[in-house]
Amino acid sequence: MSERVILAYSGGLDTSVAISWIGKETGREVVAVAIDLGQGGEDMDVVRQRALDCGAVEAVVVDARDEFAENYCLPAIQSNALYMDRYPLVSALSRPLIVKHLVDAAREHKGGIVAHGCTGKGNDQVRFEVGFASLAPDLEVLAPVRDYAWTREKAIAFAEENAIPINVTKRSPFSIDQNVWGRAVETGFLEHLWNAPTKDVYDYTEDPTLNWSTPDEVIVGFDKGVPVSVDGRDVTVLQAIEELNRRAGAQGVGRLDVVEDRLVGIKSREIYEAPGAMVLITAHTELEHVTLERELGRFKRTTDQKWGELVYDGLWFSPLKTALESFVAKTQEHVSGEIRLVLHGGHIAVNGRRSQESLYDFNLATYDEGDTFDQSSAKGFVHVHGLSSSISARRDLGIK
C-alpha cells in the first residue's frame, strides 16, 4: 500500500478540494486532521463528516482549545505580540500547533506524507513546512494548491464538478481563517486597497460606529504575566479570551484593517477581528509599564517585536525564539496586579491600575504636599546627563 497522506484540514475550500484531488491524482489514501482552536462556526462533527464526504479514509478531530490558549496565545500576551505594531498573529500562532498535531497523526496513522492547502503567495506555507522540518524532517510534504498553481476559480470549479460540499462561490470569494484568538479575512474586493470593508466581512465584532451600547468597564487580573481573573472571577486563559471576545466584540473593539509585509516579499491587505486579544495585550502591556524597571522594560519592547517577527515568519521552533521566551519568563516574575479598562465604540481605554509589585511611588511622583523627591539633586543630574551633548555642541559651534 502506498503511504497515506496526512492533510491539515480546515473544512474550507482549498483543503476540501485537496482531499479529492490527492485521491484522484496520486491514488493515496488521505487522513484529514481538523484542529478545534475555538474557531466556532460549524460543529466539528460537521467538519469531520465533510472530510469523509470529500473522500478521506479517516478524519481526526482534535480539541486543542486549552492547549492553544495556554501554550500559544499566552506567550503572545506575555510578549505583547503585535506584528508591525498592529497584527496580533491570529493565524501565525495556530500553525505550529497544527504542525505538532499533524506530526502526531502521521506517526499514529502510518503516514509518510503531510499536506497543506496553502498557496505560494502566503506565509502559511513557510510556517507549515519549516515546522515539519523542525519536528519531523523525515516526512515528505505535499502542497497541491501551491505546486499545481490552483487559483480560487479553479478550486471552485473543481468543487462544483466533483460535488464537493463547500459554501464558496465566485461571487463570495473571501478567504477566512479564524480561531479563539481572532479572525482573518482576505481576498475578493478587499484586495483593492481603496475599497472599504462591508458589513458582511465582520463576524466577531459589532459595528463600533453605532454607539448604542453602554460602555463596558472590565478589570483584568494577572499573576506573573498570566491572566487569571476577569472582574474578580477566576478564569483560565481560554476563558479570559472567550469572555473578552464577547464583551469587547459587542463594543466593536478589535477591528483591524492592515496592509502588512508578508515573509514572501509582497504586501497584502487583511481584515482582522481580535477583540479578546487586543484587550489582553493592552492590559498586559499597561501592567508591565507599572511593574517593570525602566531599562528592563525598554529592552523587553525590542524583544517583544523580535518575538512577534519570528512567529510571523514561521520560526516558532527556532533557537532564538526559545531563548527569548526564557528571557520573557524572567521578566514576568513581578507582572502581577489588575488593570481596569473601558470598552466602547471600538476603543480600549485604560483608566485604572493596581499592583502589589508596582514600582510607582506616590510620594516620589506627587507634586502635592508629602512629596519626598529631593529636587536639589536634579540640577547636578541634568548637568551630567547632558554633558556629552554640551561638549559636542560647543565644538560644533566653535565655542571655547
Curated annotation (Swiss-Prot):
* Known catalytic reactions: L-citrulline + L-aspartate + ATP = 2-(N(omega)-L-arginino)succinate + AMP + diphosphate + H(+)
Which amino acids does the record list as binding L-citrulline?
87, 123, 127, 175, 260, 272
Q: Which InterPro entries match?
A: Arginosuc_syn_C (IPR048268), Arginosuc_syn_N (IPR048267), Arginosuc_synth (IPR001518), Arginosuc_synth_CS (IPR018223), Arginosuc_synth_type_1_subfam (IPR023434), AS_cat/multimer_dom_body (IPR024074), Rossmann-like_a/b/a_fold (IPR014729)
- What GO terms in the biological process aspect are recorded for it? argininosuccinate metabolic process; L-arginine biosynthetic process; urea cycle
> Recorded E.C. number(s)?
6.3.4.5
One annotated Gene Ontology cellular component of this protein: cytoplasm
Q: Where does ATP bind?
A: 8-16, 117
List residues binding L-aspartate.
119, 123-124
Q: What class of enzyme is it?
A: ligase
Q: Which pathway does it take part in? A: Amino-acid biosynthesis; L-arginine biosynthesis; L-arginine from L-ornithine and carbamoyl phosphate: step 2/3
Q: What is its main location?
A: cytoplasm
Supply the HAMAP family for this chain.
Arg_succ_synth_type1 (MF_00005)
Its assembly, as annotated, is:
Homotetramer.
Recorded family membership: Belongs to the argininosuccinate synthase family. Type 1 subfamily.
* UniProt name for this protein: Argininosuccinate synthase
Q: Source species, please? A: Mycobacterium sp. (strain JLS)
